[in-house]
Amino acid sequence: MVSGSGICSKRVVVDARHHMLGRLASITAKELLNGQKVVIVRCEEICLSGGLVRQKMKYMRFLRKRMNTKPSHGPIHFRAPSKIFWRTVRGMIPHKTKRGAAALARLKVYEGVPTPYDKIKRMVIPDALKVLRLQAGHKYCLLGRLSSEVGWNHYDTIKELETKRKERAHVVYERKKQLNKLRVKAEKVAEEKLGAQLDILAPVKY
């Protein structure tokens, strides 16, 4: 995310679609400890290696881990994809120290792409992408699908909101494309009209 040891002062927005859970979490944890602010969007599209049935069995085994005398004391079993990812990152950070707690506070996680971040350029992390890290033909499942199987009730709502967001983004993109075409056309017309005068205007960057 950050080149070398330099830290980007701005908040980095990462599109988690088709990233591997563990690899994305480890890279994110490292950047948080280095002082980088990170926002992870579309957590429901994160990939887990292994089929859905296997991952669901693993999660059900995890659900059985509880405090016998008072289960509400923990461990807490998150169902939402964003909270599952947050907990994975927390496990890679010394979150009970001041440094670790400050690092974890720099992380924000969301399902879908909420309004402040839908207009910000999002990045991907090649070292965590499924297409580069998982063998072709290897089974995988999406975190959102797993969450919906174990008690998360907003899978369909997020899918609907994402469809609407993509439609709005497509309209904006088409409008931008038309404006670019008009600008290029206007520049050509201006060049034809100005002709030799361009040689005078170019050195002064007019």
From Swiss-Prot:
It holds the Pfam family Ribosomal_L13. One of its GO terms (biological process) is translation. InterPro entries: Ribosomal_uL13, Ribosomal_uL13_CS, Ribosomal_uL13_euk/arc, Ribosomal_uL13_sf. The keyword Protein transport does not apply. Keywords: Ribonucleoprotein, Ribosomal protein. SUPFAM superfamilies: Ribosomal protein L13 (SSF52161). One of its GO terms (molecular function) is mRNA binding. It comes from the Eukaryota. One of its GO terms (cellular component) is cytosolic ribosome. Belongs to the universal ribosomal protein uL13 family. This is Large ribosomal subunit protein uL13w. The gene is RPL13AD.
